[in-house]
């Protein structure tokens, strides 16, 4: 009943869907009353729709049971929506462990900044000149704590933090990816009328993309 499998008790494993089989596997683990659940890529073989449904079911069940769960996944949507804390690893080395919100808003390093988020954060390596850096025709004044410590910095801008307007960063759009409510513009930054070798992604309202 806890797993909503009453209607399938007379079925054989081959007659169950992928999501139902996952719930059966969870049931086998639950009856052992473990102190910790370890789930290793439990949704990797499911299609996108079923993955979303099963993800919500697992999250609801985990909250109901209150059992600590270590969830291993390469899917950041699963990690960000299901985890209280997310540990980001690269080549087996821990990069940052924090809440999903903290990872997104305050990434601990460049790897985490570029990894968390889809599309990924725009990252620009820019040279410092007179306490500022230039991104296209946009001048960014740097904090005093940064000036003098390095010759260049990496500036990160999320796609959703860019807005269409008449002033700011000029870009040539190579492709528009329409996803319904949102659309993503993929292109390159233009400075002084010349295209630069810096790609950029911007999120815009899907109801009227350029």
Question: What role is predicted for each listed range?
Answer:
Residues 119-123, 131-210:
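Non-catalytic connector elements of ABC transporters
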Residues 21-22, 30-32, 95, 120, ...:
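Short, flexible micro-motifs
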């Amino acid at each position: 009943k806890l797993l909503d499998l009453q209607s399938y008790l007379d079925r054989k494993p081959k007659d169950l869907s992928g999501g139902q089989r996952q719930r059966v596997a969870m049931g086998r683990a639950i009856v052992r009353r473990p102190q910790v659940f370890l789930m290793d890529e439990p949704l990797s073989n499911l299609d996108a729709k079923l993955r979303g449904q099963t993800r919500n079911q697992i999250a609801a069940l985990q909250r109901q049971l209150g059992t600590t769960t270590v969830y291993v996944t390469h899917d950041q949507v699963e990690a960000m929506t299901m985890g209280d804390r997310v540990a980001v690893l690269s080549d087996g080395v821990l990069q940052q462990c924090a809440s999903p919100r903290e990872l997104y808003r305050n990434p601990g390093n460049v790897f985490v900044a570029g990894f968390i988020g889809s599309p990924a954060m725009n990252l620009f390596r820019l040279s410092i000149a007179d306490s500022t850096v230039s991104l296209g025709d946009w001048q960014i004044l740097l904090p005093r704590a940064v000036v003098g410590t390095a010759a260049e910095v990496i500036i990160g801008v999320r796609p959703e933090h860019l807005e269409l307007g008449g002033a700011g960063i000029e870009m040539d759009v190579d492709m528009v990816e329409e996803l319904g409510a949102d659309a993503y513009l993929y292109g390159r930054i233009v400075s002084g009328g010349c295209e630069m070798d810096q790609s950029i992604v911007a999120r815009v309202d899907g109801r009227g993309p350029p």
